[in-house]
From Swiss-Prot:
<feature type="glycosylation site" description="N-linked (GlcNAc...) asparagine">
    <location>
        <position position="107"/>
    </location>
</feature>
<feature type="glycosylation site" description="N-linked (GlcNAc...) asparagine">
    <location>
        <position position="195"/>
    </location>
</feature>
<keyword id="KW-0732">Signal</keyword>
<dbReference type="GO" id="GO:0016042">
    <property type="term" value="P:lipid catabolic process"/>
</dbReference>
<keyword id="KW-0325">Glycoprotein</keyword>
<keyword id="KW-0443">Lipid metabolism</keyword>
<protein>
    <recommendedName>
        <fullName>GDSL esterase/lipase 6</fullName>
        <ecNumber>3.1.1.-</ecNumber>
    </recommendedName>
</protein>
<dbReference type="Pfam" id="PF00657">
    <property type="entry name" value="Lipase_GDSL"/>
</dbReference>
<dbReference type="InterPro" id="IPR036514">
    <property type="entry name" value="SGNH_hydro_sf"/>
</dbReference>
<keyword id="KW-0378">Hydrolase</keyword>
<feature type="active site">
    <location>
        <position position="323"/>
    </location>
</feature>
<keyword id="KW-0964">Secreted</keyword>
<dbReference type="InterPro" id="IPR035669">
    <property type="entry name" value="SGNH_plant_lipase-like"/>
</dbReference>
<dbReference type="GO" id="GO:0005576">
    <property type="term" value="C:extracellular region"/>
</dbReference>
<dbReference type="GO" id="GO:0016298">
    <property type="term" value="F:lipase activity"/>
</dbReference>
<comment type="similarity">
    <text>Belongs to the 'GDSL' lipolytic enzyme family.</text>
</comment>
<feature type="glycosylation site" description="N-linked (GlcNAc...) asparagine">
    <location>
        <position position="103"/>
    </location>
</feature>
Length: 362
């Protein structure tokens, strides 16, 4: 067996062991602030009644919460698992916290989840669905900081998690819109917003920053809706575009410590992590890495889970995908473990555990 194969096998065994072992750390992180899309969304869309991108109906949430919470999966998301590993309560969505704070029943002390499923880096991405774009998420955070509702010392020690862009790239290939930019120019427009995002959170006090890559967007079951996408394999053109974005994103993340004094940053290689699940499914407990557990039609990708006429699998833990676009809790668990204490194939220059325990001098 080659050394690389041995390393892959060792890593998969580590990912499959009890999450309790991985969750123990001497973290110095008092709070987590999360921005992005459905990989993180804890229910903001549910509290946004103008938003049509919803997962607030069964069987969403059925495997862990036993009720829908607004998360676009059957249980916990990456943000939830990382909160558990750090030793913090699960993050609440900003729009829920806002209501509770007005009622005097909560505060922002453990962090906030601003993510909105369906959103992107570009303002026009799914705008018609009423999602909250990254620009608005950042403005929500900025308002809290300017109103002194979050202590500066807490912000500086907190973990900032960011992941967005998959909806931008998927939408580039929608049949009813003609792209006005080349793939290269479109990706650069996305990355312009990445730079603005990092600049804004740094000015607001962020110092521990984790930016995650996109996964293989061209493999989601929802590609069955696209007339030019293959269903017997992943959509290559879409994945090429995602990898282009990821490569340039990593270059941006790598210079954060130089460009922003006092900041430390890591790049989570979500694409590579997911690709390993697809390449060695049995090692990670998967029997199906192509079809949605919950949905209907080709690949289970022609209908959203929970809508009239949907079908659901018997064991979601054996599926990579929960619905037409989103992974199962099992996938998120494995992904989160790789990001938390994985090696440089998964996250670099060091993992989230190191980022959370690293002492920062201001």
């Amino acid at each position: 067996m080659s050394s690389s194969s041995s390393m892959d096998l060792l890593m998969c065994l580590l990912l499959l062991i009890s999450p309790v072992v991985l969750a123990k750390s001497s973290s110095t992180v008092p709070a987590i602030f999360t921005f992005g899309d459905s990989i993180f969304d804890a229910g903001n869309n549910h509290y946004n009644k103008n938003c049509t991108a919803q997962a607030d109906f069964p069987p969403y949430g059925s495997s862990f919460f036993h009720r829908p919470t607004g998360r676009f999966t059957n249980g916990r998301t990456v943000a939830d698992f990382i909160s558990e590993f750090v030793g913090l309560p699960l993050q609440k969505p900003f729009l829920e916290l806002q209501i509770q704070i007005l009622n005097g029943t909560s505060n922002f002390s453990n962090g906030i989840n601003f993510a909105s499923a369906g959103s992107g880096l570009l303002l026009d991405t799914n705008k018609f669905m009423g999602v909250t774009p990254i620009q608005t998420q950042l403005q929500q955070f900025q308002t809290l900081v300017e109103q002194n509702l979050i202590e500066k010392s807490i912000i500086q020690e907190s973990l900032f998690l960011l992941e967005t862009g998959s909806n931008d790239i998927f939408n580039y290939f929608l049949p009813f819109r003609a792209p006005t930019l080349s793939p290269d120019a479109y990706v650069n427009a996305m990355l312009d917003q990445v730079n603005k995002t990092i600049d804004q959170i740094y000015k607001l006090g962020a110092r521990r920053i984790a930016f995650f890559s996109l996964g293989p967007v061209g493999c989601v079951p929802a590609r069955a809706m696209l007339p030019n996408a293959p269903t017997n394999k992943c959509f290559g053109k879409m994945n090429v575009m995602a990898k282009m974005y990821n490569k340039r994103l990593e270059d941006i993340v790598n210079i954060i410590p130089t460009k922003y004094p006092g900041a430390i940053a890591v790049f989570g290689a979500v694409y590579g992590i997911t690709h390993r699940f697809q390449t060695y499914p049995a090692r990670y407990g998967f029997s199906d890495v192509s079809n949605a557990c919950c949905g209907n039609g080709t690949l289970g990708g022609l209908m959203q889970c929970g809508r009239e006429g949907y079908k659901i699998c018997n064991n979601p833990n054996e599926f990579l995908f929960w619905d037409f676009y989103h992974p199962t809790e099992h996938t998120y668990r494995l992904m989160s473990k790789a990001l938390w204490n994985g090696n440089k194939n998964h996250i670099r220059p060091f993992n989230l555990m190191a980022l959370a325990t690293n002492k920062i001098t201001f």
